[in-house]
């Protein structure tokens, strides 16, 4: 049998054992770690870098005419202005600042989605549905993205952006959104 070819292994037999962890940066925004792990076959791998950040919400919002509400903003990581759905961090009520939180309550996530939609776009909705919750980057991060749909959004205010947010609201017809998605 080849190494790593047992796809029917039990989850316990696939788990890595943490040998050591050093917190390289730990502040209100991120916990960046360097760790050593023992693999299921007994071999040791190091360094393995990982991080914790806050869970966040992404809102697939559409207005009363069926247009999608998006925001355009500069993203430092890729050095580009992007068009994306409104999104933002979940302010946790359990005292933790970030990380590992499939424990975040559905109410906390929905409250964050409502808050972020209003802050970033000035829009609100009475028609919300939870789409899914997924790991943001399961290879190296322990936070989750909670995706919501907000339908029939209506503008009730201007933007109320955080001091580090500089973004513009754009509305995109469904056909234009499909073209953007096809382009990646």
Predicted regions and their residues:
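Extreme N-terminal tail/first-helix region
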Residues: 1-26
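Conserved Nudix-box catalytic region and its N-terminal flanking loop in Nudix hydrolases
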Residues: 2-3, 51-53, 58-63, 67-115, ...
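A short coil-to-beta-strand element that immediately follows conserved catalytic motifs
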Residues: 17, 124-131
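Short, solvent-exposed loop/turn elements at beta->coil junctions and helix N-caps
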Residues: 22-23, 132-137
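Acidic, metal-coordinating catalytic segment for phosphate/diphosphate chemistry
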Residues: 22-58, 64, 73
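Active-site-adjacent beta-strand/loop module that shapes the phosphate/pyrophosphate-binding cleft
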Residues: 36-41, 137-156
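NUDIX/MutT-family hydrolases
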Residues: 53, 161-184
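Short aromatic/basic micro-patch
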Residues: 84, 147, 171
